[in-house]
C-alpha cells in the first residue's frame, strides 16, 4: 500500500492544534476566566477535547506517519472531526461517536504494531489504546466524565510508559523486571476498573499504580543514564 506524501499529515496536524486551542480555552473557562463561550457546554468538554481530540489526533497521526499505511490516517481524521462536531453540536451524539470510532481505529493501529513486533512496549501502548476506547465507549453510553476520565488517564500514562520502554530497550531489562512492570500495570488497570464501582478504592489503587510506574522507571529508564552523558546533545535529548 502506497504511503502518503509528507505534505498530507499537515491538515491532520492543523485539526490537532485547533483541538489544543479549544481545550485550553475550555480549561481557562473552568478556571473562572470570563471568556466568550463558543457553545454552552464548551467548558465541560475540556477533558474530552484535550484527550480524545488533541492528543488522540496527534498520537494516532504520529503512528500513521511512522507506519505509512493509508488506512491509518482514518483515526486521526475521525478524532479531529469528532472534537469539532462535539463542540458545534454538543446536544447530539455524533461527536462522541466519531471520537469512539477514532479510538477503535487507534486500537486497530496498535494491533498491527503488536503483530509486527510483540514486545513489552508495544503491548503497553496497546493496553493504553484499549483504555482510550473503553473510556469513549463508557462516555458514549452515558457514564459521567468523572468516571471515564480514569480510562483516558490510562491511555496517556500507558502510551508514555510504552514509548519510554521502547527508548530504553538497549538496557535490556531482565525477565523479572518485565514481570514486575506487568504486575504494576495490572494494579493500575485494576484500580481504574474498580473506580467504576467504588470511586475511593479505585482511586487509591490506581494511584498506587501511578506511584509504582515511575519508581520502576528509576532503574529501568535510559534517561537516568543519558542525563549523565558526556555529550551535551545527548543530555538535552534525554
List the predicted regions and their residue ranges.
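Hydrophobic alpha-helical transmembrane segments of multi-pass integral membrane proteins
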Residues: 1-238
Amino acid at each position: 500500500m502506497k504511503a502518503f506524501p509528507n505534505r498530507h499529515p499537515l491538515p491532520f496536524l492543523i485539526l490537532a492544534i485547533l483541538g489544543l486551542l479549544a481545550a485550553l480555552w475550555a480549561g481557562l473557562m473552568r478556571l473562572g476566566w470570563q471568556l466568550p463561550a463558543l457553545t454552552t457546554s464548551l467548558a465541560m468538554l475540556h477533558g474530552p477535547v484535550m484527550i480524545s481530540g488533541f492528543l488522540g489526533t496527534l498520537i494516532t497521526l504520529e503512528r500513521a506517519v511512522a507506519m505509512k499505511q493509508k488506512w491509518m490516517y482514518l483515526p486521526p481524521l475521525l478524532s479531529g472531526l469528532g472534537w469539532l462536531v462535539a463542540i458545534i453540536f454538543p446536544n447530539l451524539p455524533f461527536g462522541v461517536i466519531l471520537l469512539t470510532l477514532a479510538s477503535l481505529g487507534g486500537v486497530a493501529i496498535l494491533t498491527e504494531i503488536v503483530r509486527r513486533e510483540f514486545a513489552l512496549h508495544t503491548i503497553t501502548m496497546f493496553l493504553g489504546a484499549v483504555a482510550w476506547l473503553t473510556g469513549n465507549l463508557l462516555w458514549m453510553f452515558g457514564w459521567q466524565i468523572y468516571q471515564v476520565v480514569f480510562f483516558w488517564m490510562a491511555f496517556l500514562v500507558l502510551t508514555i510508559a510504552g514509548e519510554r520502554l521502547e527508548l530504553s530497550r538497549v538496557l535490556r531489562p531482565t525477565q523479572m523486571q518485565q514481570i514486575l512492570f506487568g504486575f504494576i500495570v495490572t494494579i493500575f488497570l485494576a484500580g481504574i476498573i474498580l473506580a467504576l464501582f467504588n470511586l475511593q478504592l479505585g482511586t487509591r489503587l490506581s494511584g498506587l499504580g501511578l506511584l509504582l510506574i515511575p519508581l520502576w522507571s528509576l532503574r529501568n529508564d535510559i534517561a537516568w543514564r543519558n542525563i549523565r552523558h558526556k555529550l551535551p546533545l545527548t543530555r538535552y535529548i534525554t
